[in-house]
Amino acid sequence: YINEMGNKCYFSDENANSRMQLYTLDKLGDDWSEPLALKGISDGISEANYPFMMTDGTTFYFAAKGEESIGGYDIFVTRADTENGQFLKPENIGMPFNSEANDYMYVIDELSNIGYFVTDRRQPAGKVCVYMFIPPTSRHIYNSDAYTDEQLRGFADISRIANTWGKGTERKLALERLKAIGKSSTAKQSKSTLNFIINDRVTYTDISQFQA
């Protein structure tokens, strides 16, 4: 993951024990610094991968296998302590984003207020599924007595996506936002696209290539 400024990179790589670990790079001028292992997130974590940093520069999501994992890879969240350059102890974000399967990535597009997470639950070997969701603004505690055990298991495992839609109003608005962003991106791309053939070997693709 590279931040919007293009000067900070988070990535995973094998450490000396052949386990995946998270590292960071800083861009200095035109060059990247030497990789440094992230500090503070290794306690109770055996492997870490698929990092994502929110635009606040402190809220950090990643997938990991560890003592608090439900099964396989789970999504964890931590926050950067800018004073000492370390991260706080990671927390498992829980169900329904985590399951007994591998849950690999959690990303939020703050512009559209739409999130995405990747999992291999109920997928053929070697395949994953990307879910879209509306990021919650707060955690709601539901009365478990109002639901059967089967319903609760279904909610936790997202066995039926339609059960998460409620009245469907927020879902409809989110899809409209996504559609509007897609149209805007297409319009910008088509407006900036230029293919002007100069000769058999030269094609201009930008107006700045023309000189008086």
Kindly label every feature range from the protein language model:
Residues 1-211:
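Short, conserved micro-motifs composed of acidic
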